[in-house]
Amino acid sequence: MTEGKSIINANLTPLPDKVGVDGLEDKWRAVWDEDGTYKFRNTRDRKAVYSIDTPPPTVSGSLHVGHVFSYTHTDVIARYKRMRGYDVFYPMGWDDNGLPTERRVQNYYGVRVDVSLPYDPDFKPPFEGTDGKKIDAKDQVPISRKNFIELCERLTAQDEKLFEALWRKLGLSIDWSQTYHTIGQHPQRVAQKAFLRNLARGEAYQQDAPGLWDVTFQTAVAQAELESREYPGFYHKVAFRFEDGTPIYIETTRPELLAACTSLIANPNDERYKQYFGQYVYSPLFKVKVPILAHPAAEMDKGAGIAMCCTFGDVTDVEWWRDLKLPTRPIIQRNGRIVMDTPDWIEDPAGREVFAETAGKTTFSARKIIVDKLRESGDLDGEPTPTKRMTNFYEKGDKPLEIVTSRQWYLKNGGTDAKLNAELIERGKELEFHPDFMRVRYENWVHGLNGDWLISRQRFFGVPFPLWYPVNASGEPDYDHPITPSEDRLPIDPTIDVPEGYDESQRDVPGGFTAEKDIMDTWATSSLTPQIVTHWAEPDEASKALFASTFPMDLRPQGQDIIRTWLFSTVDRAHLENKCLPWAHATLSGWILDPDHKKMSKSKGNVVVPNEPIEKFGADAVRYWAAAARLGLDATYDIGQMKIGRRLAIKLLNATKFALAIGREDENHHVGAAAEAAWNPADVTEPLDRAAMAKLALVVRQATEALESYEHSKALEVIESYFWQFCDDYIELVKNRAYGTPDEHGNVPSEKAVKSARTALGLGLDAFARLLAPYLPYATEEVWSWMHAGSGSVHRTAWPVVDPYVEAATGASPELLTWAGKAVEQLRKIKSEAKVSMKTPILSVALSAASEGVEAIHAALGDIAQAGRVVGKFDLVAKHAEESAAEDAPETEVAVEASELGEPPAKKPKH
């Protein structure tokens, strides 16, 4: 296609006899791959580049239509920006490390890690796929950490091939040469380099502290990974006793923690307990002496108003322990069971016997034992009463979290630093949220932080911390003086690599070194995706050029549910490292709901595999359903919408073929020859054609404004609405004139009038191919190839601008087309109500409309009469506004006052 001074020159190809959407995906995907249609060139400066921080999907089995939904939103913007002339940097990543991957590998291969085992180079797993069934830990074969990591890498590689095939089928305009993996060598180097720089600046630190712990996954959990869920339990009214035996009652849902009690706490303003502050009582069963203390966090209206503080039952216990400098009395192990050895602080012989009965038990079993003992001792007042309480869970876990003291790594995020918190709030104000109301979720999260980001995990498949620790003469690691590698050695695995100045023989021996065995939380890597994809801090010239042209990035698309994790953590990392936002815009998609309006998720078992609707309706149809949904709002999985999308794609093919065939068909309606056309806006001379161009100019302007504001659904609505009007009204009105067909009286349209119609049709369908290209990439590429042979992909063509359509309209009102369409609708209604063929002639008719309508209809009267087969008198009656109101005029604004039908055409005999 060439376009100069608004003239669009077209190279028209022969047209297929039959059109359809089937087969288009394979055909055009192969062409795009061969031509490098979506390849990032990186030949221009930063202003000419549009860079997207694409969400790397978690590689843990399969995708569902929710992924298709949100990734389509991103692709629409990517395609639009490419057509606006940007060199679009649109990579894809795979989030292939972390707990979901480990869990899948355990179940898929039937294995688990035993760090004491040596590497077996010939190991073969006992299973190769278990159809998603969970294999019990007792049936899993223990293997070395290295063997386990190899299985993780093998399985994620298989999954990634399936994911890529799906994304390609959906038509995502990804540059696949820019693909990355969060466990790959390059991302590991970026994550380790960023951590070492955080450490050097004092932003990363380690600490022995109570923290949330998942007993199933055997790892610490960060605040951002919590889910608060309703959990059933029982309130137990339990007596602590003063020296003289007088009871004071507390109510608890966790009596199994009585042995860990350090104090009783009440609110300083609670008149019931003021007299007891500073006094001591003894715990039931264990006879441990504990003080009664005051703290404002105690809730006077909860339970008895006085609570026991155990180390640790919940986060409030941690707050009290820290503020009141209470002793630490942990009794729960990392596996969720009671410790085996009776604690020293329990001195009473009977108490030690009770504890011994609970040793090694699960908290559930220990609770039962303690409650029975409390009944026997008379310290349980009444029977336990059922309750439901909100309890913290790891978002991927199925058991309540415990609080365990352990050594962990933290990264500053404003949870303990008011200055940093304020700075991150300001970053949120700089960021353009789409929709804007999502900004408050970011601000609420940052304001509500109560601790720094815990970034260490006690797992196996992830990015290792690049650290070792000196081992002193007594064989104890010196955690206060970590040994770090130089950046040019990264990435490293400290369990395999050796620090400078040491050799392997010094590992884990006095006077030697020991490796940091924890790995980074998967979000600690994912939070660096902008730095990973843009090759931040890499020394080679190509990486430097890439970073300069793509960072800070333009767009972060993501789900609304991970604002607190992925979005915030990425802002935090860029603020600390780059002193700027990582991107200018963030688009937040809603959730996909099932037909019962419940969130679709793999854990709920209500997901739809995306291959199914794509196979059934086509990729363009599924994309249409996704793109019709507004950002930030939930949408229902709707097959009806997909059917509409398929119909839209087919209509585009049919309408374009029809218009391009005019004047080129042989007697068998076959178009077998190529042709050239020049669609010059100056050749649009007829009122109806000009009105169609005026409306097109308006649509181009509105769609462009919407997409510039990231309102892809609004743009689609505007484009689609006019496309159907263009097909149903405009093409029907002008097709006879475009063909040069004589009217009922034998009058042949002028050459000028014919050319006007054909030019407007060409300009219109050329524009619709481009306007719909971000939404229906396959159907638009097909029709574009019919119009502009040899000119390349529609997806590398310029987005329409209003100029040629404004020029063609020459001041016409788009309302003329609307009125003409309403008039034809009334003519059709005459025949449909009479139940006769649409080819039946109308001998005479009188239509009434408002004055402006009469004027518009009159300007297009010839086209309207021919479209409606009006062969005789065609009168127009103007109605004043007061008259229309008095008669309660129908909403159509055009009405039939009188009509007379002729004889229906004779039916052709069947052969």
Swiss-Prot record:
This is Valine--tRNA ligase. It comes from Bifidobacterium longum (strain DJO10A). GO terms for cellular component: cytosol. A motif ('HIGH' region) lies at residues 57-67. Pfam families: Anticodon_1, tRNA-synt_1. ValRS has two distinct active sites: one for aminoacylation and one for editing. The misactivated threonine is translocated from the active site to the editing site. Residues 882-911 are annotated as: Disordered. GO terms for molecular function: aminoacyl-tRNA deacylase activity; ATP binding; valine-tRNA ligase activity. Monomer. It comes from the Bacteria. It is an enzyme of class 6 (ligase).
